[in-house]
Curated annotation (Swiss-Prot):
Keywords (A to Z) from UniProt: Chaperone, Cytoplasm, Ribosome biogenesis, rRNA processing
Complex formation: Binds ribosomal protein uS19.
Role played: An accessory protein needed during the final step in the assembly of 30S ribosomal subunit, possibly for assembly of the head region. Essential for efficient processing of 16S rRNA. May be needed both before and after RbfA during the maturation of 16S rRNA. It has affinity for free ribosomal 30S subunits but not for 70S ribosomes.
InterPro entries assigned to the protein according to its UniProt record, in alphabetical order: PRC_barrel-like_sf, PRC_RimM, RimM, RimM_N, RimM_N_sf, Transl_B-barrel_sf
Pfam families: PRC_RimM (PF24986), RimM (PF01782)
Organism, as annotated: Coxiella burnetii (strain RSA 331 / Henzerling II)
All copies of domain PRC barrel, residue ranges: 96-168
Main subcellular location: cytoplasm
Gene (UniProt): rimM
SUPFAM superfamilies given in the database record: PRC-barrel domain, Translation proteins
GO annotation terms (biological process): ribosomal small subunit biogenesis; rRNA processing
Record-given protein name: Ribosome maturation factor RimM
Length: 168
């Protein structure tokens, strides 16, 4: 799988129990969405390898999963902190103007005056709206992801234009 063909959807945490189950930190919303994908790509020892999901259940704030051929805690331990990805084509199509968070991470953020504010490091879900975490060398900014604040997103040019004061 080429880097652009996959989307990171979570991370394997630590072993859970004695039968090879593993805790998972999900990057999806809701967190159990990643259980909808029967085969995961796991980045193990810097190589992507497919692993089949045998079972999974919600154990908040984590998921716990049983993956094929991982049958004991010692084997499960070797997968600690490995990234979980799926093929991009497994994601549903989005409506015009909607974006997957993963596509926004790494984009440059500039305000409407052309001042560079940094790059999108991550997103935070809050009760009222999502928030872009924008990092530069100097600071971190939390910019609301609202129709007023976000003026445009250009995935090809890798840029987000925001209505945001550079001093905030």
């Amino acid at each position: 799988m080429k880097p652009n063909d996959k989307v990171i959807i979570g991370r394997l945490a630590r072993p859970y129990g004695l039968r090879g189950w593993i805790k998972v930190v999900s990057f999806t919303h809701p967190i159990d969405n990643l259980l909808n994908h029967p085969t995961w790509q796991i980045q193990h020892n810097n190589e992507w390898q497919p692993l089949k999901l045998q079972a999974g259940k919600l154990h908040e704030p984590f998921l716990v999963v049983k993956l094929e051929n991982i049958d004991d805690p010692e084997t499960a331990k070797h997968y600690t902190n490995d990234l979980i990805a799926i093929e991009r084509r497994a994601l549903g199509a989005l409506k015009e103007g909607d974006y997957y968070w993963t596509d926004l991470i790494g984009l440059a953020v500039v305000n409407t005056h052309g001042i560079e504010l940094g790059t999108v490091d991550s997103l935070i879900e809050t009760g009222s709206n999502d928030v872009l975490v924008v990092r530069s060398k100097e600071r971190e900014r939390l910019i609301p992801y609202t129709s007023y604040t976000i003026q445009s997103i250009d995935l090809e040019k890798k840029i987000i234009v925001v209505e945001w004061d550079a001093d905030f």
